[in-house]
Amino acid sequence: MEAFHTHSGIGVPLRRSNVDTDQIIPAVFLKRVTRTGFEDGLFAGWRSDPAFVLNLSPFDRGSVLVAGPDFGTGSSREHAVWALMDYGFRVVISSRFGDIFRGNAGKAGLLAAEVAQDDVELLWKLIEQSPGLEITANLQDRIITAATVVLPFKIDDHSAWRLLEGLDDIALTLRKLDEIEAFEGACAYWKPRTLPAP
């Protein structure tokens, strides 16, 4: 996973609340066994509407999604995060995230930045007044910058650390490789053990 420090991109106003993972990517698109190729399923139920925000320029090139409260609720679906990232999003800003979505985002390299709902409303207003407005998310300082506006955001320390270090689950496990090998080496011969790679 690539480390995340700062990201700047076009802000996309998604003026919807309670966007669950089935709305982010419907189940019919979950048939792949890889982590890529889900961008076509992103918001598929809404993208058939020509007036949907991702069908409008310059928002179709956006990488910072500004969503209403309760974004990513519903079933545990890593594909929701993968679809957002495959489309090009690197940051999602909301006043409240589904817990599982927030965890999946941090594990995959997507920044889920939690701000006050008043700040979401302000960002929507700024974006709609200046389509193409660049928004910058600085994870180290935990601030969002849009034009002259600077807003703090919340993220749990563990997720922030993983993003800053670029650590997915495999990379975290590999950091403990010496301990794992020592444990395996100390196990009694009759206990199950992992085999070395060929």
Swiss-Prot record:
Gene3D superfamilies: Aconitase, domain 4. It holds the Pfam family Aconitase_C. Pathway: Amino-acid biosynthesis; L-leucine biosynthesis; L-leucine from 3-methyl-2-oxobutanoate: step 2/4. Its EC number is 4.2.1.33. CDD domains: IPMI_Swivel. Keywords: Amino-acid biosynthesis, Branched-chain amino acid biosynthesis, Isopeptide bond, Leucine biosynthesis, Lyase, Ubl conjugation. It is an enzyme of class 4 (lyase). There is a cross-link at residue 154 (Isoglutamyl lysine isopeptide (Lys-Gln) (interchain with Q-Cter in protein Pup)). One of its GO terms (cellular component) is plasma membrane. It catalyses: (2R,3S)-3-isopropylmalate = (2S)-2-isopropylmalate. GO terms for biological process: L-leucine biosynthetic process. Heterodimer of LeuC and LeuD. Belongs to the LeuD family. LeuD type 1 subfamily. This is 3-isopropylmalate dehydratase small subunit.
